[in-house]
Design a protein with these regions (language model features):
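Conserved alpha/beta core of the MobA/IspD/sugar-nucleotide pyrophosphorylase nucleotidyltransferase superfamily
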Residues: 2-10, 106, 182-275
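A structural signal for short hydrophobic beta-strand segments in well-ordered beta-sheet cores
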Residues: 32, 158-160, 234, 297
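Short alpha-helical oligomerization interface
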Residues: 26-31, 291-296
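Conserved core of the sugar-phosphate nucleotidyltransferase
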Residues: 120-208, 331
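The conserved acidic donor/metal-binding loop of glycosyltransferases
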Residues: 115-118
């Protein structure tokens, strides 16, 4: 199999209505919503440098609406791409792709990519992985903490053997009570060729057990392949950005605004008096999500949560942190605060006082 990106084909079904975005006040179809200065669909094409054979499968109503300029925008993003317009439907991405089978090279390696996310990953390494394993399909996945997973597990999840070979895949629910420790599908799906993809899609459309609330999802098209003993793998991506709902997109944009402000340096004027941070909660909701650290110590962008909160607040002459005596890891938390905040004095009913240069910092057990 060729690893030359020019020999591969990328299929992007983007014919959905985007009703949640429309209800939230967005005035263009979801793939055209701007994120960081360019439409979502441009971010997706940017994931595949060097690819030429691209097929956009669009809602014909969107193509016909002059305000959207959809065809013009797609042509400018990927001049070598083809655009297929299909009738509006609510049958899901598998159905959308099925309307354009005849536009695909049945022998070419094929990726079906949803139109509402982006990621940081190694595209070259992925093509080598597909060639070296000679597998039949790959689900591009992420794992670990991602903010959107705190309020929803409405994604496709994969159960694997040795974190590589897919054993099971299911939509809209994780396999365990610890979804952040599972592989979740990014929304990008590889098939060794379009002929195999078509066979899987057609069998999926014939099976009611693979239809979810009236829609056919690409993830579930791997079920027939797994049942036939096909070799389906997982390829882990580095960083994932979910924009599938207005809440997902808003959360991402808020996070990025914070990152920009953090990089520029927080500039609130120094305050006289005392900065008081209560850390007395036990973090029960995080514990239910299988976090093992006390909430103040959970890493956020590489630093404990309490330090990120402290860094974002105005500097003060004194810093006081209030901890519960029975909080698991309380002593480790106090030691970290001593070290990181460079406390001049830290006292509690159970821990000795220590003097260090820098702003005054006291901690005690409530």
């Amino acid at each position: 199999m060729s690893t030359d990106a020019a020999q591969w084909q990328l299929v992007i079904p983007m014919s959905g209505f985007g009703e949640r975005f429309r209800a939230a006040g967005y005035t263009v179809p979801k793939p055209l919503i701007p994120v960081e200065g360019k439409p979502i669909i441009e971010h997706i094409i940017g994931m595949y440098p060097g690819i030429k054979n691209v097929l956009f499968i669009c809602n014909q109503d969107h193509l016909d609406e002059p305000r959207y300029r959809m065809r013009e925008i797609l042509d400018s993003i990927c001049p070598t791409a083809r655009v297929a317009g299909i009738a509006p439907h609510k049958l899901g991405p598998v159905y959308a792709v099925s309307r354009a089978y005849d536009m695909l090279d049945e022998n070419a390696p094929t990726i079906v990519n949803y139109c509402d996310f982006s990621c940081v990953w190694d595209w070259d390494a992925f093509r080598r992985f597909a060639a070296e394993t000679n597998c039949d399909g790959v689900v591009m996945c992420y794992t670990g903490f991602h903010p959107h997973m705190l309020h929803s597990t409405n994604y496709a999840y994969v159960r694997t053997e040795n974190k590589n070979k897919v054993l099971q895949i299911q939509e809209k629910q994780p396999f365990t009570d610890a979804p952040m420790h599972e592989f979740a599908s990014s929304g990008a799906y590889y098939f060794c060729n379009a002929r195999l993809m078509r066979e899987a899609f057609e069998e999926t459309r014939q099976r009611e057990d693979l239809r979810l609330k009236g829609e056919y999802y690409v993830s579930l098209a791997y079920r027939p392949l797994l049942e036939k003993g096909k070799d389906i793998r997982v390829f882990e991506i580095d960083k994932f950005r979910q924009w599938g709902t207005p809440a997902d997109l808003g959360e991402y944009q808020c996070h990025m605004r914070y990152k920009v402000a953090e990089a520029a340096g927080f500039s609130a004027p120094r305050q006289k008096g005392t900065l008081l941070l209560p850390l007395a909660g036990m973090g029960s909701r995080f514990a239910k999500e299988n976090y093992t650290l006390p909430k103040p110590l959970i890493p956020v962008n590489g630093r404990p949560m309490v330090l990120q909160a402290w860094r974002a607040l105005p500097r003060a002459d004194e810093n006081r942190f209030v901890l519960r005596r029975d909080m698991p890891g309380a002593e480790a938390l106090v030691a970290m605060l001593r070290r990181e905040v460079r406390a001049r004095e830290l006292s509690s009913s159970t821990l000795p006082q220590t003097a260090r240069p820098g702003p005054a910092c006291w901690g005690w057990m409530a």
